[in-house]
C-alpha cells in the first residue's frame, strides 16, 4: 500500500494550516481524504489572502485571492500568465490541523501512554507521552514536524540536552533526517519513526500500523532486561 500523502504535505505546510482550496489541491486524489478532512482538520475564523497555484507552470508562486463581491472570489495569477480561477467562499476558509486529534490517534496506533505536553521553545514539537515496554521502564515519545534538515537538527540537539535517557523521535517522514541527526540519535539509543512508513489511515478515523509494534520499537524493547538478569 502506498504511503498516505498527507504526512509529506503536513511536513512542508507552514503553520500546519491552509485554505481549503490548498488542502483539496494537495490531497483530493487520496481516497481517505474526506475522512481525514472531517476528523483531523479544524475550521478557523480566517480567510486566505493567497492560495497555491493550480497550474504546473514551474514558477510555484501563490495566487492572490481577490473578492469583488461575496459571490465573485477569484485567485489571480500575479504574473498574468494564466486566467483567474473562480473560488467559493468555503474554499478560501483556512483550516488548520487538529493537532490534539492527530497526536491522540498516533498514540493509540503505536500503543503510547498518552500524556501530551507542548515543548517550550521548540516549534511544532510535542511530548506525546511514554512508550512503556514493561513496568518500571518508560521512554519519552516526541513528535516534531519540521520543514528543513536544519530545523530538525536544532530540535534533536535540544532534546538530547533536555532528556537524560533514550527517547523516541517521531516525524511525518524521514525527508529531513540527516546523517548527523541519525548519529546523534544512535548515540542516545533513540529510535526514529517516520509516520508515513509505519501508519496508514483506516476506514474509521484512526491509524493502523503497517507492521507489528514490537518491530517498530525493537531498539527499545532490546534494552529491557531479561527476567532474573538482575538488570
Give the location of each predicted region.
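Extended, compositionally biased accessory segments flanking or bridging domains
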Residues: 1-134
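Proline-rich intrinsically disordered, low-complexity coils
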Residues: 34, 54, 62, 83, ...
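Charged, structured surface patches that assemble and position nucleic-acid processing machinery
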Residues: 159-225
Amino acid at each position: 500500500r502506498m504511503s498516505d500523502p498527507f504526512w509529506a504535505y503536513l511536513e512542508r505546510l507552514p503553520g500546519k494550516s491552509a485554505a481549503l482550496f490548498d488542502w483539496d489541491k494537495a490531497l483530493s486524489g487520496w481516497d481517505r481524504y474526506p475522512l481525514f478532512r472531517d476528523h483531523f482538520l479544524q475550521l478557523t475564523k480566517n480567510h486566505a489572502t493567497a492560495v497555491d497555484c493550480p497550474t504546473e507552470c514551474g514558477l510555484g508562486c501563490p495566487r492572490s485571492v481577490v473578492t469583488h463581491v461575496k459571490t465573485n472570489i477569484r485567485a489571480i495569477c500575479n504574473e498574468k500568465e494564466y486566467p483567474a480561477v473562480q473560488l467559493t467562499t468555503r474554499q478560501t476558509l483556512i483550516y488548520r490541523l487538529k493537532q490534539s486529534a492527530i497526536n491522540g490517534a498516533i498514540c493509540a496506533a503505536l500503543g503510547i501512554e498518552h500524556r501530551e505536553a507542548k515543548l517550550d521553545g521548540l516549534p511544532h514539537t510535542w511530548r506525546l507521552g511514554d512508550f512503556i515496554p514493561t513496568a518500571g521502564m518508560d521512554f519519552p515519545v516526541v513528535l516534531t514536524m519540521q520543514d528543513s534538515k536544519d530545523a530538525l537538527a536544532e530540535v534533536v540537539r535540544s532534546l538530547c540536552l533536555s532528556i537524560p535517557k533514550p527517547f523516541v523521535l517521531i516525524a511525518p517522514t524521514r525527508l529531513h533526517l540527516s546523517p548527523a541527526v541519525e548519529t546523534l540519535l544512535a548515540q542516545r539509543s533513540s529510535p526514529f519513526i517516520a509516520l508515513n512508513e509505519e501508519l496508514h489511515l483506516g476506514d474509521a478515523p484512526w491509524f493502523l500500523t503497517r507492521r507489528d509494534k514490537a518491530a517498530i520499537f525493537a531498539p527499545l524493547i532490546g534494552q529491557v532486561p531479561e527476567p532474573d538478569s538482575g538488570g
